[in-house]
Regions:
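N-terminal Rossmann-like dinucleotide-binding module
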Residues: 1-48, 367, 381-386
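Glycine- and charged-residue-rich phosphate/anionic-cofactor binding loop of Rossmann-like
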Residues: 28-31, 286-290, 307-324
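Active-site loop of classical SDR/Rossmann-like NAD(P)-dependent oxidoreductases
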Residues: 36, 292-302
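Conserved SAM-binding strand-loop segment of SAM-dependent methyltransferases
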Residues: 49-56
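Beta-strand-loop-alpha-helix segment that lines the small-molecule cofactor/substrate pocket
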Residues: 66-67, 73-74, 78-125, 140
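Predominantly a Rossmann-like dinucleotide-binding segment in NAD(P)-dependent oxidoreductases
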Residues: 124-220, 339
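Contiguous beta-strand/loop segments that form the cofactor/metal-binding neighborhood of enzyme cores
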Residues: 184-271, 300-312, 329-332, 347-386
Length: 386
């Protein structure tokens, strides 16, 4: 079989994770990488045995690339996605989809018109941990979901990231850097969100680069680094969330309370067991349910997109899901600024869990209609947008 050709735009830190994992999936093949920093792209290409494209335009012009993986900074997401779409490529984007709803809608509309598909990170929702939790919910492990509690606290990435400035700029901070993992998981497990209310603060006007050649450099903080959020779902479920880069203590939690118990979801990565509490915790009735599927890593969303294209179906980590998550996060930002609740206009289509035996390391046989790269159907782009 012929693996789907992939081109990567952006050779920053996150590209290592994609290049490592995509090399282990036989259904896809990284052909080339490009970056505005030509030397950085060349170094990554040499390290992982792929080609370095001289420019992004050169990468987009290649006939052996069907999917473009957009790993640029958030401010460049829309421009790179639109250029890839104009070149007839499908797009897998890092989170967030874009920085605003107008550009996000422009990306999805352009893809719809061009007959290509946009899918978007985070692909942790395709990891065996969250997939296992979704199957348990659908099987009624905790009864009817009623409330949600999520928590993400830590000191922030400025201590370890060699170039953390963009993580404290518009389109980042804890809400847009870490929030997509939580918000996308909320939507995956509990359905569309209809309203949010938030409060935020920015305790420090400046941060300091903690590692690398720029260690000691001060830089401005452009976004709130602590947010407390209330969320209402279309189903009636109500959630409480904290997103913070201002705590020396590192804590992560994602708990769904149902009519018959509590589900602890491993939201921070691709694996880990789901914990289920049946009844009252005084009975010490917690049990761990290990995921049945094969291990998955960063880049599994690119693989699932490639298989979806060959099957002629929408990808699970779809553009409409990313659009809905983006609107939710922008609404959180607006509510924190205005002090009033904000309604969410978009929705998201239901996402079916992957089959328990779905294996990223397996070589699958493409359908006969996909030999040259099939186009997924239009609902992959339009579903969920109002």
């Amino acid at each position: 079989m012929t693996a789907t050709g992939v081109g990567i735009v952006g050779a920053g830190n996150i590209s290592d994770e994609y290049l490592r994992s995509l090399a282990t999936y036989p259904d896809v093949r990284v052909v080339a990488i490009a970056d505005l920093d030509v030397e950085r792209a060349a170094a990554q290409a040499d390290r992982y045995g792929v080609e370095a494209a001289p420019t992004v335009a050169d990468l987009l012009a290649r006939d052996d690339i069907e999917i473009v993986v957009n790993l640029t900074i958030p401010a460049a997401h829309a421009d790179v996605a639109l250029a890839a779409i104009a070149a007839g490529k499908h797009v897998w984007g890092e989170k967030p989809l874009t920085l605003d709803l107008a550009s996000a809608r422009a990306v999805l509309d352009a893809a719809q018109e061009a007959g290509v598909v946009v899918a978007n990170a985070p692909d942790t929702i395709l990891g065996e941990g969250i997939q296992n939790a979704q199957r348990l919910l659908l099987d009624g492990a905790v009864g009817e979901p009623r409330t949600l509690l999520t928590l993400m606290q830590g000191p922030g990435p400025d201590a370890w990231h060699p170039r953390p400035q963009f993580l404290f700029a518009r389109g980042a901070g804890p809400l847009f850097d870490i929030g997509p993992y939580y918000v996308s998981t909320m939507i995956q497990l509990l359905g569309p969100i209809v309203q949010v209310e938030a409060m935020g603060q920015r305790p420090r006007a400046e941060r300091v680069v903690g590692s690398g050649p720029d260690a000691g450099l001060r830089f401005p903080v452009e976004v709130d680094t602590h947010l407390s959020v209330l969320t209402r779902f279309a189903s009636g479920v109500v959630g409480t969330s904290v997103y913070s880069f201002d705590s020396p203590r590192r804590r992560q939690a994602f708990e769904i309370t149902g009519s018959e118990g509590v589900l602890e979801v491993p939201v921070s990565g691709f694996d880990g067991p789901t914990r289920v509490l049946a009844g009252d915790d005084r009975d010490h009735a917690w049990s761990e349910v290990a995921p049945p599927g094969a291990h998955r890593e960063r880049g599994v969303g690119v693989l699932e997109l490639a298989r979806a294209l060959r099957d002629g179906r929408p990808p699970r980590a779809s553009g409409p899901l990313a659009f809905h998550a983006l609107e939710v996060m922008l609404a959180v930002e607006e509510s924190a600024r205005s002090g009033v609740p904000v309604a969410i206009d978009s929705t998201a289509p239901p996402v079916e869990p992957l089959p328990p035996d779905w294996d990223p390391s397996a070589a699958t046989t493409p359908s006969s209609s996909a030999a040259t790269g099939s186009r997924a159907t239009s609902p992959a782009q339009s579903g969920g947008l109002r």
